[in-house]
Amino acid sequence: MRTPITNVNWLEHHEIMDELLYHEASLTTHPMDDGFEAEVLKINLDQESYVLKTWSKSSKPDVQFQYRLLDVLSERGVAVSKPVGWGINPDGNKVLLTSFDGTPIHKVNNKTMKELASILARIHQIDIAELEHIQLPKYDFIDYFFPEVREHTDLNQAVISLVEQTPMRQDRIIHGDFHLGNIVEEQQRFTVIDWTNGQLGDPRYDFAWSFILLKIHISERYADMFRSAYLLDNFMEQEELEVFEAWACLRWILLNRRGSTPKGPNVSKRVKSILGSNRFLKDLDFQGFK
């Protein structure tokens, strides 16, 4: 029986790939929920499971970089999936095979928030000198996280105002989209997945994005627990916190206007509350969000 891994031109892989190909007749596959960017398939062999991501949609990230990044992070004990291999399938789409590390988090508590904050803090503490051989990408902050913002006059004016008040750093590895949807759990062990946005960036923004998403979509109480736990490991001044929370809120509004944010009860109310309490945003007039 031929499987989705059979006809792939595997450009880099670990030894376990040879075993999977040797036992391909025994492999079973099960579809998983696709993300915005890729098709996702679970592959099983005996008691072991793996995840195959195929970038068949419009997004075409650097999969080789993801593979190598996961390799060095997993070697250092960071809570990421172990990469098995990456390559190109017969349709010309890039694929990545990794370990299967659990299912999405459905319930959170104080302990969960503290552990996730500790994981993110540890990622931000990695010495990038150890990762030089994988050439971490560095992008223009506005172009990357605020694409097409110039088409929104109100947001663009706010961005221009914040740029003047934010000495931006790009000296740490960041995940770029650290939230509950990109974390899985198995037997109380958390794993950070989807490193499409991994890059050299400002850890203060990376943290603020996670914090704002928790505040908007989960609860202020759990968001504050996450913040307190993170700041124990990576201290930030109050003004830094506020300015990067402003950046994160502006990005949320931009994504919301593009239809890329989850809907839920009280979401608009929470966003308005954040805008009203942030000194960098409270006097600005926004045209609304869905």
Give the location of each predicted region.
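An alpha-helical support segment within catalytic cores of ATP-dependent transferases
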Residues: 6-23, 128-176, 180-186, 275-290
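ATP-binding glycine-rich phosphate-binding loop
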Residues: 22-45
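Active-site acidic catalytic loop and adjacent metal/ATP-binding pocket
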Residues: 39-44, 51, 160-205
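Conserved hydrophobic "DFG−1" position in protein kinase catalytic cores
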Residues: 42-43, 54, 85, 99-100, ...
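A conserved alpha-helical element in kinase catalytic cores
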Residues: 49-96, 104-125
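Short, polar/flexible loop-turn hinges at active-site or ligand-entry regions and domain interfaces
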Residues: 103-110, 130-131, 217
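Active-site activation/catalytic loop segments of kinase-like enzymes and analogous catalytic loops
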Residues: 204-236, 248-263
